[in-house]
A protein has these predicted regions:
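Conserved N-terminal structural module of periplasmic/extracytoplasmic solute-binding proteins
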Residues: 2-9, 15-102, 106-108, 117-124, ...
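Extracytoplasmic/periplasmic substrate-recognition and gating elements
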Residues: 61, 162, 247, 289-356
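Paired acidic/hydrophobic, glycine-rich loop segments that form the ligand-binding mouth/hinge
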Residues: 90-94, 276-280, 298
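Hinge/lid segment of periplasmic solute-binding proteins
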Residues: 97-149, 190, 212, 369-372
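Glycine-centered hinge/linker elements that transmit conformational signals in sensory
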Residues: 178-179, 225-258
């Protein structure tokens, strides 16, 4: 999965004009004389797309009644534009689970309840967090297709050279280790022990979702109201982050990051030794194996707030969601494929082995087909930790998080003079956005 930003609500609002003209197919598959051609849109590309196509090819070979075409490098904008035009593919998937509130709330993805009921799908096979980010207000328009959890990657050689014997467990330890591991040359950064910069790769996505479970921080209360200003955890996190940015020097950090390679390439800053530690998703294990198998590294849960040692082992969780778009011409055949991809142990284990994402059902996580890997095992544990959390699902989709990201970028640049007042203003913006979108959502 890849984190992307942007808002879908304005685009999907335009779909209403065609909604009445489109009728959802029944949950009863009909016999067809000729193979039904299914088109599947996914966000994966390159190596990961090849792995997905391999999984689909197995299904295709066993089901002569369908012929499946997989299209990669798809994003949410392309999906919503296709739905709006009335010519969507048969199956769609998205890396942005936070947008499920928009997809379910607007009806852009159809309700899967009739299919789930017909085939007696036991939803308890999916962990609680995955069930949460594939529905909105009880309407389930998606299912999880593998999952992501975030943890700490660290360079073992750099740790040994700095005399650090084990990965940090608290943010105080993380700060101390980051400073020990940092290397400078001629006043410029050569190696950053830990880069806290909001927007630096997926781990430090600016909306802070990957840090919220580490500080027991919540975005919304039980009524769906934003509470960033009233929760001390957010101020504590932001002040920690700004202090470490200032220690490096904001301008120096910006110049240093200008030399980073693309996140999803062999030039990734951690992979080439420019970062000693980094928060990242489990997929990095596969990238490292393919691009830098010689690198000696370790994985661990992310450190946690010193005041909450009980949270150690938890982390941020999200994942790819898959569903059937409104207006799809073959919903029954599309559902059969979605069901296979999301519930078949072999399919999930094979795909997990290929791209090293977390299997999204309890049984597939224990499948004999799943290849063991000690670095990957860290993320399986994080995914199943009861304190792990995901982003809040609201009618506004990812738009709330976009607002948060804009604020944190200003904060780290020193453009927010009063943190509490700034967070209060942010809360008002989020509440207004949710109200306009049709209501808030549970935290």
């Amino acid at each position: 999965m890849r984190r992307v930003t942007g808002t879908l609500l304005a685009v999907l609002a335009l779909c209403g004009a065609v909604a009445a003209a489109i009728t959802m197919g029944s949950a009863h598959a009909g016999a067809r004389a000729k193979p039904v051609k299914l088109t599947v849109w996914v966000g994966w590309s390159a190596r990961e797309l090849r792995e997905f196509k391999g999984v689909v090819a197995e299904y295709d070979a066993k089901h002569p009644e369908v012929q499946i075409k997989v299209v990669g490098s798809i994003n949410d904008t392309k999906i919503t534009n296709a739905i709006r035009s009335g010519n969507p593919p048969d199956v769609v998937s998205s890396f942005t689970s936070a947008n499920v509130g928009v997809y379910c709330g607007t009806g852009a993805w159809i309700d899967l309840a009739p299919f789930l009921k017909k085939d007696k799908i036991d939803l308890s096979q999916f962990p609680k967090t995955s069930l949460y980010y594939t529905q909105y207000k009880g309407k389930r328009c998606a299912l999880p297709l593998l999952a992501d959890s975030y943890g700490l990657y660290y360079n073992k050689a750099m740790f040994a050279k700095a005399g650090i014997k084990s990965p940090p467990k608290t943010f105080t330890e993380l700060t101390a280790d980051a400073k020990k591991l940092t290397q400078r040359s001629g006043g410029k950064l050569k190696v950053a022990g830990y880069d806290p910069f909001w927007g630096e790769y997926s781990g430090n996505v600016a909306d802070m979702t990957n840090y919220s479970p580490l500080f027991a921080a919540k975005y919304l209360d039980s009524k769906g109201k934003a509470i960033l200003a009233s929760q001390f955890a957010w101020s504590k996190l932001l002040r920690w982050q700004k202090k470490l940015v200032d220690w490096y020097g904001y301008d120096k950090l910006v110049r240093f990051q200008a030399g980073f390679g693309d996140e999803f390439s062999g030039s990734n800053a951690f992979e080439v030794g420019k970062l000693a530690m980094m928060m990242d998703g489990e997929w990095r294990v596969a990238f490292l194996a393919a691009e830098h198998p010689e690198l000696k590294y370790g994985t661990a849960p992310m450190p946690v707030d010193d005041a909450h040692p009980e949270l150690y082992g938890a982390g941020s969780v999200n994942g790819t969601i898959i569903g059937i778009p409104k207006g799809g011409k073959n919903p029954d055949q599309a559902w059969a494929l979605v069901k296979y991809l999301t519930t078949d142990n072999h399919a999930l284990a094979r795909f997990s082995n290929g791209i090293r994402n977390v299997p999204s059902t309890r049984s597939s996580a224990k499948s004999k087909d799943l290849k063991p890997d000690k670095n990957f095992a860290t993320f399986l544990k994080i995914f199943n930790n009861p304190h792990s959390t995901t982003a809040p699902i609201t009618a506004a989709g990812n738009a709330n998080l976009t607002l948060v990201g804009r604020f944190t970028v200003k904060w780290q640049a020193g453009k927010v003079k009063n943190l509490h007042n700034g967070l209060k203003a942010l809360d008002k913006q989020i509440d207004a956005q949710n109200a306009q979108a049709g209501g808030g959502g549970p935290p």
